[in-house]
Amino acid sequence: MGKYFGTDGVRGVANSELTPELAFRLGRMGGYVLTRHVGEHPRVLVARDTRISGEMLESALIAGLVSVGIEVMRLGVISTPGVAYLTKAQGASASVMISASHNPVDDNGIKFFGSDGFKLSDDQEEEIEQLLDTAEDTLPRPSGEGLGTVSDYFEGKQKYIQYLKQTIENDFNGYHIALDCANGATSGLATHLFADLDADISSMGASPNGLNINDGVGSTHPEALAAFVLDKKADVGLAFDGDGDRVIAIDEIGQIVDGDKIMFICAKYLREQGLLNNNTIVSTVMSNLGFYKGLKELEIEDVQTAVGDRYVVEAMREGNYNLGGEQSGHIIFLDHNTTGDGLLSGIQLINVMKATGKKLSELAAEMKTFPQKLENIRVSDKNHVTDNPKVSKVIDEVEAEMAGNGRVLVRPSGTEPLVRVMVEAATKEETDEYCERISAVVRSEMALND
């Protein structure tokens, strides 16, 4: 990735790193690159999550788009996958989502989608970066009727909800579903969707105020929903992240059902229905060893990619696969949408429950997980973790002790100044000990001095 774009668009602290000035330039440069071959007044959709900085960045971004002659349709607050779907459904030339997903409220981000609803290629992002770095802005500056326009398309939310309902064959009558919307983009979507599907609903994290997105709620804090599920005696819980492209489930006894287990459950069901393309699922290197052992027992093939849903989607498109995702809850059903979609994944999961008549705890128990621990360490330069000799040495030592019965993954985050240390081993005690041993060296060698 380059100077501006990470694995999921441009991100930074809003108003200091991701400034209105940068948003304006991203609108101009990004809009130009994505629409220059379209003709006069190409259409671009713009949406945001619930962060307090969203409207500021939206205004600046739209000004940039309009300045190169683009017709902007504002969707307001809607999930990232909602934007991806509507891009194709509305015949737009491109779309832009303003969100930092699961990151804290101080952060924000800008990510583009092409006319096909997919995230941009590396080449497209590189071209935008080159324009951003050009000293003089020589892009067109139309005037009069050559300028773009701005209109609102808030009814797009309902069109997206109606589409989601068409992807399953069952309603959810008789199910009590607990929803955690992370005080984010699904707050105005999830309850309407599940009510339309005749479910009994209890919701939390659905009162955004601009400052509380992901704050102790959502897919990065599933323990909050676990307690809520038990309190409300719900059959299942679904926790989304700030922009709605992830989901983590909770079963009826309060156990967390992560992305690996959701993918496993859905892969098994799709295979039984003859709907799993090429009998293959795509995952990342972060998926649990138990996930792969479970797939092997079912004789389902797997393809592994680097961490990041964009890499999962690339592999799915290249291999004509229709199911893939990440342990973190990004799950892609490529028959139905072009990116991870928390609402879509949630209804697919509950559809399996309804079709099989099984509780979520029963379905999840069919995949056994290895104990796993993940440490996130804030560092001064995350990209040097792979060539630090002391870090490499402790990893080699731990892997030798494991003797093949576990694994270690140490990598820089694609979206934050963090090094992620992930360890799986035969027992929880070994997992904790190995993870702390490696993390201690990473902290000693690389951690920021607070």
UniProtKB/Swiss-Prot annotation:
PTM characteristics: Activated by phosphorylation.
Entry-linked Pfam families: PGM_PMM_I (PF02878), PGM_PMM_II (PF02879), PGM_PMM_III (PF02880), PGM_PMM_IV (PF00408)
Gene3D superfamilies listed in its UniProt record: Alpha-D-Glucose-1,6-Bisphosphate, subunit A, domain 3, Alpha-D-phosphohexomutase, C-terminal domain
Cofactor note: Binds 1 Mg(2+) ion per subunit.
Record's GO cellular component terms: cytosol
Cofactor entry: Mg(2+)
PTM annotation (Phosphoserine): residues: 101
Top class in the EC scheme: isomerase
EC number(s) on file: 5.4.2.10
Tree of life domain: Bacteria
GO terms for MF: magnesium ion binding; phosphoglucosamine mutase activity; phosphomannomutase activity
InterPro entries (UniProt xref): A-D-PHexomutase_a/b/a-I, A-D-PHexomutase_a/b/a-I/II/III, A-D-PHexomutase_a/b/a-II, A-D-PHexomutase_a/b/a-III, A-D-PHexomutase_C, A-D-PHexomutase_C_sf, A-D-PHexomutase_CS, Alpha-D-phosphohexomutase_SF
Binding positions for Mg(2+) per the UniProt entry: 101, 241, 243, 245
UniProt record, GO biological process: carbohydrate metabolic process; peptidoglycan biosynthetic process; UDP-N-acetylglucosamine biosynthetic process
Protein's job: Catalyzes the conversion of glucosamine-6-phosphate to glucosamine-1-phosphate.
Cross-referenced PANTHER family: PHOSPHOGLUCOMUTASE (ALPHA-D-GLUCOSE-1,6-BISPHOSPHATE-DEPENDENT), PHOSPHOHEXOSE MUTASE
Name the record gives this protein: Phosphoglucosamine mutase
Annotated organism of origin: Listeria monocytogenes serovar 1/2a (strain ATCC BAA-679 / EGD-e)
Gene responsible for this protein: glmM
